[in-house]
Each structure stands twice: as C-alpha cells, then as structure tokens.
C-alpha cells in the first residue's frame, strides 16, 4: 500500500495507525481485562516514504494472560478481528462491524437490520470436540452519542468515565514510549 495524503499518514503528534486504530483496541482490552501490569510495543514505519506508524504489535502483560493488539496497513484479504485462546478452546472472528458501511449505503440506525451481521460474519468457537458459529450481538454507535449529549446537557452520566479515558490515553502513550525505547515498560506509572 502507498502512503496517502491524509492526517493519519503524516508525521506529527497523534498520527499513524497506532493513534488511529489503537485507541479502539486499547479501550476494548481495558474493558475486558482491566489495566495491564506492563506493555511491550513495536510501532513501525514499514512502507517506503512512510513517516507515520503503519504497523504496530503491542503486548499487554497481565498476571494470567497476554493480550496482543495488532494493526497493519499491509493486511490484505480477510483479517482476523478477534482471536481469543484459552484452556476451553479458541474463538476467532473475522471482519468489521457493519455499521459504518451501512451508514455509507444510506441505511439509517433505526432500521432493524442496522447492526445485525449475516451468518458468514459470525465468530467461530473451536473446542476439543466442537466447532460452533457464534452470532454477533447487535450494537449501535449512536447510543454512545446519545449518552454523551445527555451528559453534556447535565441530564446523564458520561458513556466513558474520565478516569477510564485518561488510563486509555496513558496506555497508548506508554506503548509508544515502549516502542521508542525498545523495551517492556511497567504500567505502574499510569492512572
């Protein structure tokens, strides 16, 4: 892939694939696993003429597991969205949430099919004895913005607590520092 003239591919603070996709992945990891003990990251510029991160591989170290956050502009074809491996089996999910593409196609959020995925996009749970398709739960980005508007108007709670947002930002910056320094960094310094 070629470098394109857009904000995330230009050098500077907050640019690159890690700052574009990373916050979403970090948020999901923090929601599922909490704050890690340490982080090891490699944020790289692999494309010719690239001045902003276009490939990242981040390990979040927890007491009983490691979480891998990975993104690359080189990934072609069907990409793994989630892969969870545990003692009871493995879960694999390909593809992206359908909401953005549906919105571009003119489908409105109040449509019953808004965030529903077809069976081909379901995740698969593999155990020692079975292989089972797991339907994706329906979501709605618009709920976040409704909650945010209510919080701004003073009539509701923010969809994300300030402390959670600050922890996410600190972890993103710590991962970038880990990559720059070439070593694992403890998360004790973040909120």
Give the ranges of each region predicted by the language model.
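Glycine-rich phosphate/pyrophosphate-binding beta-alpha loops
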Residues: 23, 70-78
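Predominantly a Rossmann-like dinucleotide-binding segment in NAD(P)-dependent oxidoreductases
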Residues: 1-49, 57, 182
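C-terminal glycine/acidic-rich active-site capping loop/insertion
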Residues: 83-159, 191
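C-terminal helix-rich "cap/oligomerization" subdomain common to oxidoreductases
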Residues: 147-191
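Short acidic/polar mixed-charge low-complexity motifs
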Residues: 35, 63-66, 78, 89-90, ...
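Solvent-exposed beta-strand sheet faces enriched in polar/charged residues
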Residues: 39-42, 70, 188
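A general structural signal for well-ordered alpha-helical segments in protein cores
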Residues: 25-26, 141-146, 172
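Active-site beta-strand termini and strand-to-loop segments that position acidic
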Residues: 58-64, 84-86
